[in-house]
A protein has these predicted regions:
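Alpha-helical propensity feature that highlights long, continuous alpha-helices across diverse contexts
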Residues: 1-182
Length: 182
């Protein structure tokens, strides 16, 4: 998949967690809804996403690309495949994806994302430490999922956002979900 999708992954993170001035939880849903008519909102958000992507260091760009790489695994777990869409933007049926996620399945996917993130950071040379340090590659959240749930339950929301926003990121990049044959 292309960097356009990784750009939206980064934009979601910046809008939800990194930049307080951008703070808006459903930014990708809003962007998707304004996409079809190329409204001023969509154009502004797209430029903002591109600007934030251009400022991002290459290792963090790769972190976004790696997250995208896991999408096919998440989708297969739910019985979906990913394909190029004939429509622009691709149609999203929320009832097909997010609305039907049982709590146990969401928990499984969130846990998978957490372990994917831990592995990505560890392979890149990061180590667990009490304080985050980008120079020495240290991060306090490199820990097992069950420990994260106990010590930092608010952080689990980031992993859940990866799952909830997956269809929007794919649609904005011109991809769609389809039900795999049983």
């Amino acid at each position: 998949m292309q960097d356009k999708l990784a750009l939206y992954v980064n934009y979601l993170y910046d809008c939800c967690y990194a930049d307080e001035s951008l703070k808006q939880k459903e930014v990708l849903k809003k962007m998707y809804e304004s996409y079809g008519n190329h409204s001023a909102d969509f154009i502004l958000m797209n430029h903002q996403a591109q600007y934030l992507w251009n400022k991002l260091s290459e290792p963090l760009r790769w972190a976004n690309r790696y997250q995208l790489d896991a999408y096919s695994v998440f989708c297969r777990t739910l019985g979906y495949g990913i394909r190029r869409s004939d429509h622009s933007p691709a149609h999203i049926s929320e009832s097909m994806f997010n609305e039907d996620l049982p709590a146990q399945v969401l928990y499984l996917l969130v846990r998978m994302e957490k372990y994917r993130w831990n592995a990505e950071r560890t392979v890149a040379g990061w180590k667990r430490a009490k304080v985050k340090d980008k120079v020495f590659l240290q991060h306090p959240l490199i820990m097992p999922f069950c420990e994260l749930l106990q010590k930092h339950p608010e952080e689990v929301e980031k992993d859940a956002d990866v799952i909830y926003n997956l269809p929007y990121i794919l649609a904005l990049g011109g991809y769609e979900l389809y039900r795999l044959a049983d």
